[in-house]
Amino acid sequence: MARFRGSITKVSRRLGVALAPKAEKYLGRRAYAPGQHGQSRKGKISEYALQLREKQKMKYIYGVLERQFRNYYKKAVSQRGVTGENLVKLLECRFDNVVFRAGFSPSRAGARQLVSHCHLRINGNKVNIPSYQVKPGDVIDFREKSRNMDAVRNSLNKTPDSRIPQWIQVDKANMKAVFLNVPERADIQEPYNEQLVVELYSK
């Protein structure tokens, strides 16, 4: 499946938020848009531009391209409840995102690689689809030959327990995680406003 391969740091500077952990230190040093006129860009932002920016934030944070993102929106509309919250929950339940949240990888891009390269299982079955929707009660663990990966061990060791969300139970010693429940919107601390995205698609 196609995915973004450009500089996430440049995109973060353009949108004004850190879209990945590695972009945080660069954004702190250069908190303005890239390019020759990045520091001088001022002026009132239109409503459409604000809505578009929020959509871009969500797409880049979760590593989703336009067609797939639009499909998530359509599914969110068809579900009961608040459309924006449904959209966030669908994105948070992606397999690669849950792997990232569990601390198995320091980034969603790295988590996507772990999934795509068949290192992980769900309920004992090999799953290599990053967009797979993880369900409450699902157990995620590593295949036997993948359990001694230094990169994963290092990521787990560097991930404080306080960073692991309450809806995921992680057994670091056995490199295993249990997806306890779908998170509520209030539990998601990401720098986007999904309601503006809903307004954009509702036009």
From Swiss-Prot:
It holds the Pfam family Ribosomal_S4. Transmembrane segments: none annotated. Keywords: Ribonucleoprotein, Ribosomal protein, RNA-binding, rRNA-binding. GO terms for cellular component: small ribosomal subunit. GO terms for molecular function: rRNA binding; structural constituent of ribosome. PROSITE patterns: S4. Disulfide bonds: none annotated. SMART domains: Ribosomal_S4, S4. GO terms for biological process: ribosomal small subunit biogenesis; translation. Residues 93-154 form the S4 RNA-binding domain. Part of the 30S ribosomal subunit. Contacts protein S5. The interaction surface between S4 and S5 is involved in control of translational fidelity. Belongs to the universal ribosomal protein uS4 family. One of the primary rRNA binding proteins, it binds directly to 16S rRNA where it nucleates assembly of the body of the 30S subunit. With S5 and S12 plays an important role in translational accuracy. This is Small ribosomal subunit protein uS4. It comes from Chloroherpeton thalassium (strain ATCC 35110 / GB-78). The gene is rpsD.
